[in-house]
Amino acid sequence: MRADKSLSPFEIRVYRHYRIVHGTRVALAFLLTFLIIRLFTIPESTWPLVTMVVIMGPISFWGNVVPRAFERIGGTVLGSILGLIALQLELISLPLMLVWCAAAMFLCGWLALGKKPYQGLLIGVTLAIVVGSPTGEIDTALWRSGDVILGSLLAMLFTGIWPQRAFIHWRIQLAKSLTEYNRVYQSAFSPNLLERPRLESHLQKLLTDAVKMRGLIAPASKETRIPKSIYEGIQTINRNLVCMLELQINAYWATRPSHFVLLNAQKLRDTQHMMQQILLSFVHALYEGNPQPVFANTEKLNNAVEELRQLLNNHHDLKVVETPIYGYVWLNMETAHQLELLSNLICRALRK
């Protein structure tokens, strides 16, 4: 997919309510599968429905559909074979059949905690369905095996119809995170406040949302073929910005005298306003897929870093700077540097 594709208002609305969309997809898939079973009078008709729900339940982004499809179908076929062998062993020796099933379930558990959890899950589910057939009724076992494979194929078909794209979801979540960060930033350093605002819950939510985005990195990288290191870099900077914002708030409201000094510093106010505008440009770039406005921020951020560094040097020479003032100015300088890095990474993520 094109990384610089502009997001329409409809797409943004759909991805913001992806749980409703996914629930609707599963419901329609269940109804269509049920109608197919009734239309063709398929024996052991419970198992295609069970398999379809088990496979479609966890939401699959497009970057995971193909590899998970092979994992699930492979697990289903292997589970069917293991189950049929177990039924044959039961005719020879029940203890031998139990040992075989135990070994198969060990494989299921081992794979479930590895890199192929879906394959392990389907091996166990299919094995349980097949060996649940009455003793010696191979026809029933074969029908159940075929039903599980049918349910897997139908689930893959429905999952592949208008799938959720992790990269689009990642862009929307990052834009939302930066928007919320900008709001907290404005609230914390507003010149109209007389007391420190209570923003602890908002900061915690920002950090929690940043951590949740990590699950989108792998499928988004597969969809766009953008190196995971770029997503990881953006993830790290996003988390760093939230942590530094909390430290900035502490320094800004540390003491009343230092607060008034920072409040009346024109360069700092200009820097704050510039950072707010830059954050908005990031949000627009993520929604519109156009990194050009972000390129223009690099020079502004470089100038801001130099001005803040000069401000620190001037106060350092006078030896009258208080610790909160020095810390706040230094954190502003580091924030500007982090935004510069974020600007470069967003441009690379939205490349054509």
Map each language-model feature to its residues:
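A transmembrane helix-and-boundary motif of multi-pass membrane transporters/channels
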Residues: 1-210, 217-218, 222, 341-351
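A membrane-cytosol interface segment of integral membrane proteins
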Residues: 240-247
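Long, hydrophobic alpha-helical segments that serve as membrane-spanning/inserting helices
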Residues: 1-23, 169-234, 247-352
